């Protein structure tokens, strides 16, 4: 069975893994998933990530907890295959008044809403993380 939305699958695996207090979650790897994981690590939402395997690479994301509670409180997919959401640089959302991060796919690659605003770029809003 083919997967219709691999990014939603990734976010759901992370959400479910944290709900079950897992140390790490595994999923099929892609360049976009690795870029999202790198952004989550840079923003401090996950401990680490690694790509394993050659023929069918798997992405392993090590989840982060603080005082036995998941660091990620909210993980919401915004732009999806059925309804793409694009924003100009002036209309980029601020998640939870700046406490969260909007993952934005720009012409210069994947970046946070703050970095996109600083670079003067708009793009597709992939997800919200808080």
From Swiss-Prot:
<dbReference type="GO" id="GO:0019843">
    <property type="term" value="F:rRNA binding"/>
</dbReference>
<dbReference type="GO" id="GO:0005840">
    <property type="term" value="C:ribosome"/>
</dbReference>
<dbReference type="Pfam" id="PF00410">
    <property type="entry name" value="Ribosomal_S8"/>
</dbReference>
<keyword id="KW-0694">RNA-binding</keyword>
<dbReference type="GO" id="GO:1990904">
    <property type="term" value="C:ribonucleoprotein complex"/>
</dbReference>
<keyword id="KW-0699">rRNA-binding</keyword>
<comment type="similarity">
    <text>Belongs to the universal ribosomal protein uS8 family.</text>
</comment>
<comment type="subunit">
    <text>Part of the 30S ribosomal subunit. Contacts proteins S5 and S12.</text>
</comment>
<dbReference type="InterPro" id="IPR035987">
    <property type="entry name" value="Ribosomal_uS8_sf"/>
</dbReference>
<dbReference type="InterPro" id="IPR047863">
    <property type="entry name" value="Ribosomal_uS8_CS"/>
</dbReference>
<dbReference type="InterPro" id="IPR000630">
    <property type="entry name" value="Ribosomal_uS8"/>
</dbReference>
<keyword id="KW-0689">Ribosomal protein</keyword>
<protein>
    <recommendedName>
        <fullName>Small ribosomal subunit protein uS8</fullName>
    </recommendedName>
</protein>
<dbReference type="GO" id="GO:0003735">
    <property type="term" value="F:structural constituent of ribosome"/>
</dbReference>
<comment type="function">
    <text>One of the primary rRNA binding proteins, it binds directly to 16S rRNA central domain where it helps coordinate assembly of the platform of the 30S subunit.</text>
</comment>
<keyword id="KW-0687">Ribonucleoprotein</keyword>
<dbReference type="GO" id="GO:0006412">
    <property type="term" value="P:translation"/>
</dbReference>
């Amino acid at each position: 069975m083919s997967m219709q939305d691999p990014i939603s699958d990734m976010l759901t695996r992370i959400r479910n893994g944290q709900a079950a207090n897992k140390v790490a979650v595994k999923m099929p790897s892609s360049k976009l998933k690795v870029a999202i994981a790198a952004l989550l690590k840079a923003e401090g939402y996950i401990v680490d990530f690694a790509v394993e395997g050659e023929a069918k690479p798997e992405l392993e994301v090590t989840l982060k907890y603080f005082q036995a509670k998941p660091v990620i409180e909210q993980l919401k997919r915004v732009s999806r295959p059925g309804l793409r959401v694009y924003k100009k640089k002036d209309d980029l959302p601020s998640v939870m008044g700046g406490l969260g991060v909007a993952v934005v796919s720009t012409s210069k690659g994947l970046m946070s809403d703050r970095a996109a605003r600083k670079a003067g770029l708009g793009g597709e809003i992939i997800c919200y993380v808080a």
